[in-house]
Design a protein with these regions (language model features):
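Signature of N-terminal electron-transfer/Fe-S-associated modules in redox systems
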Residues: 1-225
Length: 225
């Protein structure tokens, strides 16, 4: 998490997470994940295990989850990795949170396409709702982070909130997304304007049948001319 301070390995953290272990359901998932790799290559499973652990911590704390030091040590021991190697992976990728976050982790893209298309307005909407970069709101609901490219440049500006993208945002639509979440609702995922995925704003110019239905054109491709 780019803007958040790293949580030190303090006694309170160890008291809370020192006895971390997989839930029965997640233990089955871990076995399946490690089984994807050849014998002796189990360390390749470190990324999906970190993600799974973060989600388990999130479920236990009713937040988006994070990775306390004892949890990373637990994963390292299971995979035969030094803790520092696990930590190196966790600190490289911004989808791993090294500090507690709120129920909704609001990640605002601030790179060039989003900046040119209005990411400052998106951040202003967040600020108006009481969100501060690198911090969690007092009610524990939102954590705001400014991140690098999230891969939806054609739909700039955009944010990722937990596992969902909200795209083609304005000040007003970002405010509405946050308000809906604060009220316990689920905003529309994806483009916040009248647009199908990343098609032109005026609508698609080809394959128009796919606008209203998941039309499968492959049957036509296989027909003789």
């Amino acid at each position: 998490m780019a803007d958040a301070p790293h949580i030190p390995d303090e006694a309170e953290t160890r008291a809370r997470w020192g006895d971390f272990e997989w839930t029965p359901a997640n233990a089955i998932k871990v076995k399946e994940i490690i089984g994807r790799y050849p014998p002796g290559r189990q360390q390749s499973a470190v990324m999906p295990l970190l993600d799974l652990a973060q989600r388990q911590v999130g479920a236990e704390t009713q937040t988006q989850g994070w990775l306390p030091v004892p949890v990373m040590e637990y994963i390292g021991a299971q995979l035969g990795m030094a803790y520092m190697r696990v930590y190196e992976v966790a600190t490289f990728y911004t989808m791993y949170n090294l500090a507690p976050v709120g129920r909704y982790h609001v990640q605002v893209c601030g790179t060039t396409p989003c900046m040119l298309r209005g990411s400052d307005d998106v951040l202003a909407a967040c600020k108006n709702k009481g969100l501060v970069k690198g911090h969690t709101t007092p009610d524990g609901l939102f954590t705001l982070t400014e991140v690098e490219c999230l891969g939806a440049c054609a739909n700039a500006p955009m944010v990722q909130i937990n596992d969902d993208n909200y795209e083609d945002l304005t000040y007003d639509s970002m405010s509405a997304v946050l308000e809906t979440l604060a009220q316990g609702g689920q905003p529309k995922i994806g483009p916040q304007i009248d647009r199908q995925t990343s098609c032109p704003e005026g609508g698609p110019t080809t394959l128009k049948e796919m606008v209203s239905e998941n039309h499968d054109y492959r049957g036509r491709w296989n027909q003789p001319a």
